[in-house]
Amino acid sequence: MTDSVNTRELALGVLMEVTEGGSYSHLVLRSVLEKHQYLTKQERAFLTRLAEGTIQRMLELDYILDRFSKVKVKKMKPVIRNILRLGVYQLKYMDAVPASAACNEAVKLAKKKGFASLGGFVNGVLRSVGRDLGE
């Protein structure tokens, strides 16, 4: 299970560099994959799909988040915004990931990044999205 948390954390790092640093996603992702060659083929595929898919569908994910969060996406802290984007992408597009895992791992990631006080917020938003999607 720690590998999946690590993989999600790496995906968050890619997303942060792209959205906040203005880097190109394919270059950041390639760099991360080269740096973490110990990842299994399955983990590399999960990381790639999660990072690229979230970036490709960012506008749609933000629209969904705005519908379910009292705090608008533009007002959220960048780390929380990107954790929620990753979570919604997993709920909507990654059928192999159970809704409970997507929510719980997002909360763990928020706590690990120093936002323990926002764990309930992350959980509430993602659970609401999951219910709406029929999870």
Identify the role of each PLM range.
Residues M1-E135:
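Class I Rossmann-like S-adenosyl-L-methionine
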